[in-house]
Amino acid sequence: LARISRSITRRRVPAAAAVLPSRSADPLLRLCTFNVNSIRARAAHVARFLERQKPDLVFLQETRCTAEQVPAMEFAGLGYKTHAVGQAGGRNGVAVIARIPFEVLAEALPGDAEDSQARYIEVAAAGIRAAGIYLPNGNSGGDAGFAYKLAWMDRLRHVVQARLDAFEPFAVLGDYNVCPTEADLAHGALPATDALVHPESRARFRALLHLGMTDALRALHPNETLYTYWDYGPAFEANRGLRIDHALLSPELAERLEACEVDTAPRAEAQPSDHTPLIVTLRDT
């Protein structure tokens, strides 16, 4: 496996020391997740999205480059600071882009010191903790690849449990590579054997909800057909998609949930990512 291009922070930071003061200028906080499928190829797409939606904090997945190769200056001109966790070889990679102050708490998911894949970043900002994740797909690598996915989800559950036990306002946004139910994919979009719909993948996603996390989109849109991913080709025009990008909120943040939307505009652009942004709006405390 390729090595992460920045040092990994595995020490848990106490909430009192890590969480930054809440902003007072704006009563709303807008968080976003966006799998860009190569940040260097999609930098202009991201910049247009930032200009149009003006989110406060954005988690990116599948940046597909080292941290130093992320085009941070393109976003700095719009008032956004970038922190990336990269990986050589054009694989994986996550980043956070924010126009509000933030502190990086972790650059790797705890629980496996040998895991060098760039899939997790956790920050403190605006009085909350938030993590951006790129959960393993699980379809490649045979049985070992699927086992890695399940183990990764188990590690994530332990992190979420710790945050909930500490009563910390916590959000986990990203590409989960899981369709939680049959309502989260177009009919016939995936075979029943696919790792994104496998019963064990879905069970581990439900386990996060059973801990007390809230699926932000389904909390506000329980019955709507909403997708965040469409394969290249005619899938987008036919709305033959998947809902695999999610925002899960702790009880403290679920109480503040104002809106959650899928922004399909970036997916409709020329040469887009196969994903599109998911935006969560939280009321101030």
Stretches with model-predicted labels:
Residues 74, 78-79, 152-246:
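Metal-dependent phosphoesterases centered on the DNase I-like endonuclease/exonuclease/phosphatase
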Residues 261-285:
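Surface polyanion/phosphate-binding segment centered on an Asp-His-Pro turn
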Residues 89-104, 235-256, 282-283:
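Conserved beta strand-loop-helix elements of the APE1-like EEP
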Residues 31-35, 46, 50-68, 130, ...:
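Active-site beta-strand/loop signature of hydrolases that rely on acidic residues for catalysis
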Residues 22, 121-125, 280:
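Short acidic-hydrophobic surface loop/beta-edge motif
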Residues 63-66, 70-140:
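Structured beta-strand-rich core segments of catalytic domains in phosphoester-bond hydrolases
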